[in-house]
Amino acid sequence: GKPKGCQHSIGGYLAYVAGTSKYIQDIHPEDVYWCMADIGWITGHSYIVYGPLAMAASSVIYEGVPVYPDPGRPWRIAERLDVNIFHTAPTTVRMLRKAGPDEPKKYNYHFKHMTTVGEPIEPEVWRWYHKEVGKGEATIVDTYWQTETGGFLCSTMPALQPMKPGSAGPAVPGIHPVIFDEDRNELGAGAGKAGNICIQNPWPGVFQTIWGDRERYVDTYYAKYCKDPKSKDWRD
């Protein structure tokens, strides 16, 4: 689609992706980390470049598509480079499952955990990812966030929260989400209604503006639920 023009900060953005890389993905300097995403996408910015490199880890970058010349390519790369943390999107997991459901068994690699990002992952796809790709051992870190947020907002955390197929888990530390309906009424747990996810507090990774269009930035992201347009207090 058309680029949004999200303008991120420098220090705050780096601090947030470094923090989530360390505390959510548990990346350490000795790890070989592979985020199998497009480097031109926010996931590539945050979790191919800035996050793992800020942790002094080795970050794998590859060219081409995962299933060419054959669907065993990702697992060969993982085996050859001793990748121990894997990160990809449900769309890619579905593609790999369809193209070569038994391919992971052919290769000797070991992931301690695997991240999923970008969209919901169906429980049956999640189970294949865990059983076949993760060999029944790797923890799945199921995340929710978007371009505007800079890094993870919700996620299961390795060893701290139980995995649930198809669920991205609770808010990460420092993030306080709430669900509002169209009239700014809060929808509590069990409300049985759809609403809009809002974050009640600022955080270092949140984007600063839309490039060249601050009015659209305010109208799109803040005006709907703003209690006092003249206030300078973020709580309003």
Give residue spans per PLM region.
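Gly/Ser/Thr-rich phosphate-binding loop
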Residues: Y50, A57, N84-T88, R97-P165, ...
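Active-site glycine/GP-rich loop and adjacent strand/helix microenvironment
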Residues: V117, C154-T156, G169, A189-G192, ...
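Active-site glycine-centered loops adjacent to acidic/histidine catalytic or metal-binding residues
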Residues: G1, D38, G118, W145, ...
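Conserved AMP-binding/adenylation subdomain of ANL enzymes
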Residues: G11-V32, I42-N84, A99-P101
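Conserved AMP-binding A3 loop
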Residues: G1-A15
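Short Gly/Pro-enriched turn/cap motifs at secondary-structure boundaries
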Residues: P162-A171, G188, K224-D236
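Conserved beta-loop-beta connector loops within the AMP-binding
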Residues: V178-N201, V206
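Conserved ATP-binding/catalytic segment of the ANL
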Residues: C198-D236
